């Protein structure tokens, strides 16, 4: 991201940052982690080139939301388990919304930079230098190729792809890059166990929670209550979108999916929405929640990384949130858009 290309004299800061966040977020599955890791590198680089610090922080916070939509994504995995939907189909359904969100945000950031006259001091880039940079990163770039190629090619399941990618990353870190010693390897194993244990406990409690609600017929009662008020698909989806946006601002995405999926799924299926389509809706909603004031987690992380006031960053993020909401509405009311790769609605 330090080597930012220029287009018509305007430094296209959004392009490398959004693409980097898409890859990093897809691998990590965490919006806040993406903001922390990428923001620490890109925010200082942008401010050195004359960009406003608050705009740079808001841009990275928004870019961190995009990675959650790009497969392989933890929220899609958790939803697939909760709703008994094919995780592979969910991954494919997340590609179009993620790319659409990234493109509209790139366009906005480019226009904003051009309006402000932020041309920066980009270095001259040639095909040779870009090729050399790609060659230097070839081992790291193979990770998403293994994961996505293995899953979409039908060679392996998401679980098998994750295991192979983890083993590949260990080999590369230990023997090729030689940046991971025994101590760092052990620390990475401990951190991985901590992260995995959280998800395992969460899913165990989710199963118990879902069984209790099923026995008590809570989802059916809520579905009958909402559908008793209105049977309009447009109104029901609008109300659910508002609910998910509110929940996404203060609740961790995986927990929200586990709790809300068994409650809302009977409602949306009652108005003709498929579980696959609803998976896209809920994940895109919760991704937007990461950057929605006043308690969007990505905003807090970006504020800490940039050492900037939260309210100023939130103000800069509002136009980006509006564009993300536009993508959400398209994905909600035009299911053929996010599901075009899957091939069924």
Give a label for each model feature.
Residues 1-13:
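Single conserved hydrophobic/aromatic residue that forms the stacking wall/gate
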Residues 10-345:
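Alpha-helical transmembrane segments of multi-pass membrane transport proteins
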């Amino acid at each position: 991201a330090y080597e930012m290309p220029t287009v018509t004299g305007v430094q296209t800061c959004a392009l490398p940052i959004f693409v980097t966040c898409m890859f990093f977020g897809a691998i990590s599955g965490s919006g806040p982690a993406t903001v922390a890791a990428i923001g620490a590198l890109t925010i200082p680089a942008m401010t050195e080139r004359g960009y406003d610090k608050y705009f740079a922080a808001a841009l990275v916070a928004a870019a961190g939301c995009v990675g959650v939509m790009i497969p392989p994504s933890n929220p899609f995995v958790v939803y697939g388990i909760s709703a008994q939907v094919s995780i592979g189909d969910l991954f494919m359904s997340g590609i179009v919304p993620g790319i659409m969100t990234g493109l509209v945000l790139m366009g906005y950031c480019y226009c904003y930079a051009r309006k402000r006259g932020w041309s920066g001091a980009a270095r001259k880039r040639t095909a040779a230098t870009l090729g050399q940079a790609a060659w230097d990163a070839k081992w790291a770039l193979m990770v998403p190729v293994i994961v996505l190629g293995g899953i979409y090619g039908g060679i392996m399941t998401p679980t098998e792809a994750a295991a192979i990618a983890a083993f590949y990353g260990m080999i590369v870190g230990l023997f090729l890059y030689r940046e991971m010693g025994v101590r760092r390897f052990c620390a990475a194993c401990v951190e991985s166990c901590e992260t995995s244990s959280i998800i395992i406990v969460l899913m165990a409690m989710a199963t118990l929670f879902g069984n209790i609600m099923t026995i008590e017929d809570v989802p059916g009662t809520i579905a009958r209550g909402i559908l008793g008020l209105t049977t309009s698909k447009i109104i029901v989806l609008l109300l659910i979108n508002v609910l998910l946006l509110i929940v996404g601002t203060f609740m961790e995405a995986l927990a929200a999916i586990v709790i809300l999926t068994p409650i809302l799924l009977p409602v949306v299926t009652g108005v003709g929405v498929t579980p696959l389509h609803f998976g896209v809706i809920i994940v895109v909603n919760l991704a937007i929640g990461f950057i929605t004031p006043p308690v969007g987690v990505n905003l807090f992380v970006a504020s800490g990384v940039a050492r900037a006031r939260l309210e100023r960053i939130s103000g800069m993020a509002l136009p980006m949130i509006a564009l993300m909401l536009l993508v959400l509405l398209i994905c909600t009311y035009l299911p053929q858009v996010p599901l075009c790769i899957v091939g069924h609605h």
